[in-house]
Curated annotation (Swiss-Prot):
Compartment(s) of residence: Virion
Positions of N-myristoyl glycine lipidation: 2
Alphabetically ordered keywords of this record: Capsid protein, Glycoprotein, Lipoprotein, Myristate, Outer capsid protein, T=13 icosahedral capsid protein, Viral penetration into host cytoplasm, Viral penetration via permeabilization of host membrane, Virion, Virus entry into host cell
Lineage start: Viruses, Riboviria, Orthornavirae, Duplornaviricota, Resentoviricetes
Gene3D superfamilies, per database record: Membrane penetration protein mu1, Chain B, domain 4, Protein mu-1, chain B, domain 2, Protein mu-1, chain B, domain 3
Gene designation: S6
Organism: Aquareovirus G (isolate American grass carp/USA/PB01-155/-) (AQRV-G)
Protein name per its UniProtKB record: Outer capsid protein VP4
Glycosylation sites: 110, 407, 493
Amino acid sequence: MGNVQTSTNVYNIDGNGNTFAPSSQMASTASPAIDLKPGVLNPTGKLWQTMGTGAPSADSLVLVVDNKGEYTYLSENMRETLNKAVTDVNMWQPLFQATKSGCGPVVLANFTTISTGYVGATADDAFSNGLVSNGPFLATMHIMELQKTIAARMRDVAIWQKHLDTAMTLMTPDVSAGDVTCKWRSLLEFAQDILPLDNLCRSYPNEFYTVAAQRYPAIRPGQPDTQVALPQPHPLGEVAGSFNAPTSEVGSLVGAGAALSDAISTLASKDLDLVEADTPLPVSVFTPSLAPRTYRPAFIDPQDAAWIAQWNGDANIRIITTYQSTDYTVQLGPGPTRVIDMNAMIDAKLTLDVSGTILPFQENNDLSSAIPAFVLIQTKVPLHSVTQASDVEGITVVSAAESSAINLSVNVRGDPRFDMLHLHAMFERETIAGIPYIYGIGTFLIPSITSSSSFCNPTLMDGELTVTPLLLRETTYKGAVVDTVTPSEVMANQTSEEVASALANDAVLLVSGQLERLATVVGDVIPIASGEDDAATSAIVGRLAIEATMRARHGGDTRALPNFGQLWKRAKRAASMFASNPALALQVGVPVLADSGILSALTSGVSTAIRTGSLGKGVSDASSKLNARQSLTLARKTFFKKVEELWPSQ
C-alpha cells in the first residue's frame, strides 16, 4: 500500500517504507513547558500616538483606544512564545480536520495589528522609548480571542494527548544509548492487539500517526506514491530533541544546565551565604517551616527542651475532675512524670498517637475501665513545686476517647495494647493568656481508683506527639524569645537531643532549614558521593590546612607540613557527612563540621563553583551513566526482538 499524502498532509499508518528506529541521538520532545507566565509576556507597553500637528512630545501623546480596546506591543520575546503555543496547537491539525473541529490552523498574524507610534507604560515613558514604525500590536479584544482559541483547542488536545501517550509508551520510542530497530508492521500489530478498544488511536490511526511523526524521532513515514522522491519528515522538536538526548561525553546538557540554574537561584533567594554569620540577623531572614514534627515527650529531658516540664513528687497526687457529668481521677506519679509546658508551646494542632502502647491490666485493674484522654492541668505554682492536690487549681479535658481502655485494646503476643488511637487538641496561645502555670498531659481518666494505681504511672506521654504548627508568632532559642538569630552561635552549640526536640519556631530549626537547603544544593551539583576531589571538599581542606600547619610548626620547625593526603580524606568525610545529614553541623563535638569557619568556607567555595559552573557538569559521571544506559538499550533490543517473533510482519 502506498503512503499517499492527502492535501491535509496525513500519512498512512500502513504505508510502504514506514520504519521504527529509536536512537539515543534524539529524544522525543514537544512543548510541555511553554512559559506563558507574567514576566515573559508582560510588560511590553501600550500604543501611544501624537495628537495635533505640532512637534511630537510627551505632552502630545494620547493612549490609542478604539472599539477593540487598547493596543499592547507584541515584543519579539512575546511573539516567539505565543508562536510556540500556536505551533503546538497546529501540530494536531490532522485530528482537528478529521473530527471537523476548529477552523483551520491558528495564525498569530490574524490577531495582530500593524501600527506606528510610541510604546510605554505612560506618555513620558513611551516618548523616551522612541518611535516604533510598523510594529505589531495586539488589541484587547484580539488578546481575549487568541486566548479562547488556544484554550478551546487545548481542551481537545489534552484528550488526544492522553490516547497518544498510551499508544507510544506501549511502543517505547526512546533509548538512552545506541540505536535499535523493530519491524514497523510487527510493532503495529503488537499495539493494535493490546491497545484498549476505546483508545482513539484506533479510530483515527492515520491522523495520530501523522501527529506522532512530528513528535517522536523513532517514527519515520515512508515515501509517498509520487514520481518525485520526498525527504522523510523529521519531528518539529528536533532541536530540543537533540539537546535533550544524553551524550556519552557529558551526559545531559539540559539536565546539567537545569541543575546549575536551580542551584544558583536557591543560593541567591535563600541567603545561604549567611549560614555562619557572626552578627545578629532578624528572624525574617530565615524561612520557618510549618511542617509537622513528631516527638516522644516521655523520653525528652526538660534540660533539652524548654517546652517539657517534669513533676518529681515523692507521693502520688490525685485530682478529681468532672467529664460528661461523671467524676474521674487524674493521677500524677508514681515517679517522675513529664508533661508539656503549654506556655512554651507554639500555636499548633497536637496529636498524641498512643497506638500500640502496652496496657498493664494485670498490674493495674483500674486502667481497664479508665478512659484515655489529653488534659490541661492548671497549678498555683510551677509543676516541679507541686507537692499536694491543693496545689492544682483545675483540670480541663481537651480530648478523650469514646470508650474505656479495655474496649480499645487488642492482644498482641499475650500483651494487651491500644488499638489505633489518636488524641487531638487544637492549641492557640491566647486561650491561656494570663495563666502562668498550665501543663498538658496524655493520661487516663480513672472512674474508680484503687490502690492498684499506687504503683503504676498512668501517663500516656510515651506515645508519639505530632506538633503541626498553625502560626509562628515568635522565635525562641534555649527557651528564650528572641528577635534576632546569630547563626555562628547556633552552630556546633547543640546536643543531638536538643536538635531532635526543638519546636518549629526554635532558632535551631531555622538555621537547620538553611543548612538543609545548602546541603541539597551541594548534593545536586557537587560530586561529593564520588571518589573524586570536589569544590566542597577543597573548601574544607583549605581551612584544615591552616590549622594543621600551625600545629605542625608549633615545635619550632618553620617548614614543617602536615599530611595533606589525610586532610583531604578528613575533608571528604566531613563534606559527605554534611550533604547526608546537615543538622550535624549544629551539634557539639562533630569532627571537622563543628570547627569554626568550616561551614562558611564550604558555603563560599560551593557558591563560587556553582556560579562559575558550565554545562559540562555531568562529565564526571558520563562514563558510568553511559554503561548503565547501554544495558537498558540491550534490554530494549530484546523486547523488540520478542515483538517481531510474536507478531511476525506479513
